[in-house]
Amino acid sequence: MVHKPVLLNEVVEALSPKDGSVYVDATFGGGGYSRRILETAQCVVYAIDQDVVVKKYFDELLQSFPGRLNLAISRFSKLREVVLSFGVDKVDGVVFDLGTSAMQLADASRGFSFMNSGSLDMRMCSSALRDAAMFVNTVPEKEMADVIYQYGGERYSRRVARAIIDARRKCRINNTGDLATIIRSAVPRSRVHPIDPATRTFQAIRIWVNNELEELQAGLEAAAEVLKIGGKILVTSFHSLEDRVVKHKFRSLCDMGFSLINKKAIMPTDEEVKNNPRSRSGKLRAIARVE
């Protein structure tokens, strides 16, 4: 399954790539943003992704744009170091497409989805020290409930944590299917918001495993450091926690020589949501360095 980048047209329009410019695609994934940027102008893209699986998509895209595309397998909190490692000091723009990719969700062995039972992993970087199995089978009940509430917004977080603790006392929880069943037993299904009861808890665990909010904060700070005057940072987020980090960081940057490109987040059109249901929760925020 190929990942469809959300708000692609809006991102490229706001970025407005120019010939001779240098851009960073901080979340390469399937290469959708990078491809469109490279098609739009005779520029160079430095791509970053912590998932080694993306090398396949990078190699394919490189054939179309030899000498103009580079990849570093790294976290975007290391963005500044990556840019410097390529011999570049400042760039003209940085784009972020947050969250999981369609490829990650489709691969049951990665553990990101409960649609098909797979390993309790959820690591975006295969060398990361902690995974979902560690969270589910070792984290104390109170900490577990707090994570599920804070990162997932799950109002029944205490019930979910209690159900997981009770289940792991009987035997180790080893796969996403079993975990989803345990969560569903603790969360009443809502008639008003008919999402799967496991959705919020899976999101919370994924954020914990990958330290996503701290990574995002560090990535935005690094992007601001490497940006030229006139350069832009664009971020597409998919849940309120991510969006809050972006909004607050952009607000603080406005006191440091930056200006918002759009005061309100840009949302996907009805047509895009119809063609790509994943886009429905997408929000694009953009900021430019003006001094």
UniProtKB/Swiss-Prot annotation:
Domain of life: Bacteria
Reaction(s) catalysed (UniProt annotation): cytidine(1402) in 16S rRNA + S-adenosyl-L-methionine = N(4)-methylcytidine(1402) in 16S rRNA + S-adenosyl-L-homocysteine + H(+)
Protein's name in the database: Ribosomal RNA small subunit methyltransferase H
Keywords recorded for this protein, A-Z: Cytoplasm, Methyltransferase, rRNA processing, S-adenosyl-L-methionine, Transferase
Signal peptide range: none
Organism: Anaplasma marginale (strain Florida)
SUPFAM superfamilies listed in its UniProt record: Putative methyltransferase TM0872, insert domain, S-adenosyl-L-methionine-dependent methyltransferases
Molecular function terms from GO: rRNA (cytosine-N4-)-methyltransferase activity
Record function comment: Specifically methylates the N4 position of cytidine in position 1402 (C1402) of 16S rRNA.
Transmembrane segments: none
Database matches in InterPro entries: RsmH, SAM-dep_MeTrfase_MraW_recog, SAM-dependent_MTases_sf
Pfam families: Methyltransf_5
Biological process according to GO: rRNA base methylation
Amino acids binding S-adenosyl-L-methionine: G31, G32, Y33, D49, F76, D97, Q104
GO cellular component: cytoplasm
Intracellular or extracellular location(s): Cytoplasm
Main localization of the protein described in the UniProt heading: cytoplasm
Family: Belongs to the methyltransferase superfamily. RsmH family.
